[in-house]
Design a protein with these regions (language model features):
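Conserved catalytic-core segment of NTP-binding enzymes
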Residues: 28, 61, 170-173, 177-178, ...
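Short glycine/serine/threonine-rich phosphate/pyrophosphate-binding segments
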Residues: 79-89, 110-113, 183-191
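A short interface-forming secondary-structure element
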Residues: 2-35, 40, 47
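Residue-level signature of catalytic and energy-coupling elements of molecular machines
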Residues: 34, 67, 78, 104, ...
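Short, basic phosphate-binding NTP loop
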Residues: 37, 42-69
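Phosphate-binding loop that captures ATP/GTP phosphates
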Residues: 93-157, 161-169
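Walker A/P-loop phosphate-binding motif and the immediately C-terminal alpha-helix
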Residues: 70-107
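Gly/Ala-rich phosphate-binding loop of Rossmann-like dinucleotide-binding domains
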Residues: 35, 90, 94, 195
Length: 208
């Protein structure tokens, strides 16, 4: 969208990634480049914005509605900082101008409600689709919102996978650029099944 009116030039600069902190510097660099490289230019106006792209997912899967990109955060075992990495990644993306959601898929140790400082129960208008909770600018859903804090989880295998699929697909995510999935620790059937059924665009593996 380039417009030229005599010595006045204006155009749009659109980033396809979260870069709110870089917009001002890029705008100034673009203005300086036009003034130094194009003769006769007196005034330059640059409209710098962010429009995050949707990236490719696994074959046979389609991106979820209202979610551009899903990033899975996993680890080979518990206690290595996976959930901390997931929440810090989410908050960093929010700080850079992205719309971010967090799915706490760690059924046996849901920690995202505590990390995001969110309490209470999510609401549902129709008894099926659940509105996500929100904290620090992050839309969040966790099994921790739906059960009592001291209730032990005795689910295994297919029950866990089914519950996580419901949390993923029956949450009313609102126009997300990124959905961060805090995976259960380990590399068992649950993780393999989720990786085959969830349209993941990227992954972070937290190692020891």
């Amino acid at each position: 969208n380039i417009q030229v009116d005599g010595g006045d030039v204006s155009f749009d600069l659109e980033l396809s990634y979260p870069g709110k902190s870089q917009l001002d510097g890029l705008r100034k660099a673009a203005i300086a480049a036009v003034r130094s490289q194009v003769p006769g230019v007196e005034n330059v106006s640059v409209n710098a914005t962010i429009k995050i792209q949707t990236h490719a997912v696994q074959r046979g899967l389609k991106p979820m509605p209202n979610v551009k990109n899903i990033i899975a955060v996993a680890s080979g075992k518990g206690g290595v900082g996976k959930s901390t990495t997931a929440v810090n990644l989410a908050l960093a993306l929010v700080a850079e101008g992205a719309r971010v959601g967090m799915l706490d898929a760690d059924i046996y140790g849901p920690s995202q409600p505590t990390m995001l400082g969110i309490t209470g129960r999510p609401q549902s208008d129709d008894g099926q689709i659940i509105d996500p909770m929100e904290g620090h600018g992050v839309q969040a859903m966790s099994i921790g919102f739906l059960i009592d804090e001291d209730t032990p989880m005795v689910w295994r295998g297919p029950m866990v996978t089914s519950a996580l699929e419901q949390l993923l697909k029956q949450t009313n995510w609102k126009d997300l650029d990124y959905l961060i999935v805090d995976m259960p620790p380990g590399t068992g059937d649950i993780q393999l099944t989720l990786s085959q059924k969830v349209p993941v665009t990227g992954a972070v593996i937290v190692t020891t």
